[in-house]
Structures are given as C-alpha cells and as structure tokens.
Amino acid sequence: MIGLVGRKVGMTRIFTEEGVSIPVTVVEVEANRVSQVKTVETDGYNAIQVTCGSKKANRVSKPEAGHFAKAGVEAGRGLWEFRLENGEEFAVGAELTVEVFNEIKKVDVTGTSKGKGFQGAVKRWNFRTQDMTHGNSLSHRAPGSIGQCQTPGRVFKGKKMAGHMGAERVTTQNLEIVRVDAERNLLLIKGAVPGSTGGNVIVKPAVKA
C-alpha cells in the first residue's frame, strides 16, 4: 500500500481513559494530490507521483508549472513517489487524505534527521572518552588508533571517525498510530519521528508489522 507525505508539527502528549500519558508526535497530512501515474508501459514500473501543500507562484519553475498544469493540480511544495502493487489504481488529480490510515495500526516514518554539523567521535559514534587525568593531558576525546602500520598503510573505508553528523534520510519503524483526526488532517503517532519541526515526513504502513 502507498504512504502519505506530511509535515511534522511537534510533540505533545495525550491521556488514556486510565490516565496513562502517551507521548505523541503530531503530523499534519494535507491532501496528497496525484500529479502523475507511472505504468510499466510508459516508465517501466508502476507508481504514483504526489504533491502536497502549496508553493508561491514566483517560486514555481516553468518546467514545474507545465507539469502541474498538465495534471490539473495546484503546485505543491515538492514531489514524492510511491510504488504501486498489482491491482492498485489511481487517477491523475485524485486526492489522498489521512483517512487511508483508519485501518492501519503500525507505520514507518521517514524524514531528514536534524543536522549536527561537524562532530567528534564521542558524540557521533558514542566512543568512550579517555582518562581525564593520570597523565593524559591532550587526548581526552580523541578517537585513539585508526589502523595499523605500513601494512596496509591506509585507513580502511567506513572507519568511525569525526565528521559531518545528521541531515540524512532516516526511517523509524513500527510506530503506533494513536489517533487519526480526519477533521483537522492530523496523525498522532506514538513516540518521536525523525527531523525537525516543520520538516517533511513520509508515513507508510509498517513493513514489519
């Protein structure tokens, strides 16, 4: 089944009838408009392309304007694609709302994690720090050895070292849908989801449910 594109609003909590506090992330899912339908005959695979939200007219490029005009949909803030399974059919211009999750209990949420800039090995990879005293005066947060000597004479690819952290695509799996608010186009998902407030997130039915 396809997913939906939403916007992370923030976190709050709701209470059950027993008084148990549940931390939830609020995801606003505006109607996803189908801007293109891809088929095996035309594109080699079955998928739909969707857009959501809106974009200022002066921010829409001419190719984008032509693409949206051909589909007869309002220009959105981006384009996303979902593969279709056999038997699923959608028409260009159709709108997908948060109600598609009425029968879904678990979802996977994909977003862009918060950027942390250039970070050391302790923060980036949870390395242990070295002694604060006992003769150590320079290497408290240093990573230590990064390899051998002249054989192999290089640092292996993938070695955990300091570097850019965050701002990458992250998926959190098997999150529980606590509530679907169709009136306000909101999804209340238990726990935290990747990304900063206001960021785009993709919500799909869980693959491991």
UniProtKB/Swiss-Prot annotation:
Subunit structure: Part of the 50S ribosomal subunit. Forms a cluster with proteins L14 and L19.
Cellular component GO terms, alphabetical: cytosolic large ribosomal subunit
SUPFAM superfamilies: Translation proteins (SSF50447)
Keyword Ribosomal protein carried by entry: yes
Function (record text): One of the primary rRNA binding proteins, it binds directly near the 3'-end of the 23S rRNA, where it nucleates assembly of the 50S subunit.
Name under which the protein is recorded: Large ribosomal subunit protein uL3
Organism of provenance: Aliivibrio fischeri (strain MJ11)
Gene: rplC
Domain of life: Bacteria
GO terms, biological process: translation
Keyword RNA-binding: yes
Keywords of this entry: Methylation, Ribonucleoprotein, Ribosomal protein, RNA-binding, rRNA-binding
Post-translation changes: Methylated by PrmB.
GO MF annotation list: rRNA binding; structural constituent of ribosome
Database matches in Gene3D superfamilies: 3.30.160.810, Translation factors
Family of the protein in this entry: Belongs to the universal ribosomal protein uL3 family.
